[in-house]
Structure formats: structure tokens, C-alpha cells
Amino acid sequence: IDNVCIRGHVGQMSLKAHGIDLSREHVKLNDAMLSDADIIVELSDTVPPDTTPSENFWKINLDRLKLRNSALAVHMPGDTLSVKTIFTNALATQAYFDLYKGLYTVRHIDWDGGGLRYDQNYEPAVRGFDYNHLLLAALSIKADSFYYCNSRIDLKVRQAMFREKSGLVVDSLRGRFMMDSLKLALPDLKFSTPGSQVRMKMAMDLNAFDDIRPGILETEVHGAIGRQDLMLFIGNALPRALARTWPRYPLVVNGKMRGNLQKMHLSGLTLKLPKTFSMTADGFVANLTSPERLRSDLNLYATAHSLKFILPLLPRDVTNVIRIPDGIAFKGRVHVYGSRYGSRFVATQGGGTVRG
């Protein structure tokens, strides 16, 4: 195989075939088993390709494939990306491979115990949940179908659970995963952790975060995110004092977003932290990565039930003379253009009203 180096060892491998048709280039495998194997696949872009004409028309039907205590690692060219999977006990049934078309399908997957490691090797590691360096343990996946052809993946996950090195524990994950060379789609994803329950839909162009002519990210989210999970994802972006005093209630999130970092539209986006605050926003935010060029036009309704958790952010001489009352409400339209802010609003607290 051009540009591929495969090495490692296999403890035990067995195949049972009751139908090999050489004339039709077709193999019927009843059972296959791989045990105590450690295989490394290294892809290289420096090896000249084999230009000898050859075509592989073989097709393989596989009834059952068992993997036990085995590992498979893949290293991309230049070792920019590496992925390692560990199978404690896995079973795949009703598989079909067409080597000429590059078509691979599996009817059922039952992966019970193992792990997965994903590393963007030239990206620095960060605290919390690190998208570039994932390490999943106690991994269990039950899938009803898997399809791969022409860089298109379609996977239907019936049930999955795992632990991530950051501390994230996923008790249940269900949904469909679709991806090709241009787009990623999660049409109906549901997942829960000990402190969170979320249902979401997402469709994203893979160039959605490009600087020039970016694609579109579209997502709809409904659920509640527990404090521990929230801090894994945004804790590093918050001031330490605020992260310490953040209330221990789940953050309720509902709404839709569509756009990219150049311009993001919000539709019915609602954030609610019980006994603390609630906020609903519609409109857009633009130039998200350039604070000096930030623009927004938002219809905003917010109620602050209690803002005591932000007091550590204020200087002591301020908190000694100023008290932030409970029950502040704000309704208005907010404009931001760089360092300039403007709003037409009504703010109320108790029996008082301020208009601007």
C-alpha cells in the first residue's frame, strides 16, 4: 500500500471462511478473531507512490469480527495527528467491504471496554477539556450501523459512555454522526453526565472557523449544564475569583445560533441560572475574535435575581460603599460598535424605573 507502514505484533488471529470465489473476487468470512494485538499504522507523504497499474475488485462479507485486548494506532503524515484505540472486548457483525469502491459498512458494533486517544501533536496542551488532546477511558459504544465511502462517514450510536481525562464523565450518549470532506452533522444528539442533560442539533461546514470566506455553523441546544461540566469548558476563560464563586446550580440553555466568527445570529437564546439570573437574546454579534471591531445588535431581556457571586470581581473599596440590589430587570435593544455602546432600555428594581 502506497505511503503506508504497518508494524506491530499479533498474539492470536483466526479466520473461518466457507465461501471463497476466486473468479468473482469475493470472500465470505463467517468468523474472524484478533486477540492480544498491538498494531501501528504510519502514513507518510514522502514515499513515491507505486505507479504500476493495479485494481483490487475483491469484496468481503464478514458475519462476525471479535477483538480482544487489542490496540490500533494511526499516525498521519509528519505525525501531525495520531489516534489510538484500545479494544478490551469488541464485536462487529454483518460487515461488508468493497475494496475497489473503498466502501466499508457494519450492521452492528458492540464495543465494551477500552479507550481512545486523539492528539493534534503540534498543538499545546491546555487545562480543562482540551479539544486537541482527548483521552477517553472506560469506553463503551453500541452502534446500529456504520458506513464509510469516499470520505463520508455515517454512524448511528444507540448508546455510549466514557470518562475523559479532564474529568468529564458521560453516562449516556445517543445520536447520529455524519461527516464528509465538507461538513459535519449531528442531527439529533442526546447526552447526559452526572450533572448535565443536553439535547442538540448541529450542522457545520468544516471551514466554519476559517479567516477567509468561512462556512456556516448552525446549532440548536436545549438542556441544563452542571457547574462541574461548565467549568471544564469555560473555567479557563473566567477570572479565578468568578470561577470560585460561580453558583452550584445547573445553567439552563435553550436557543439557536447560526453563523461563524465573522457574524453569528442568535434566535431565542435563553440562559438561566436558578436564583441568580435569566437572560433572553435575539440579534447578532459580529467580529467575535476582534474586540476592537466587535459589533452587535441585540434585543435583550434580563433579570438579575442575585448577583452576589460577582462581588469578588469588584475592588473592596467599591463593595464597602455600594450594594447591588436583588431583582434588577432590563429590557431593551443593545448596540455595540468597538468601544462604543448604546441602548434604548427600561430597567426596573422594586418600585423604581429607569429609561434610557
Where are these regions (language model features)?
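N-terminal targeting/secretion presequences
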Residues: 1-356
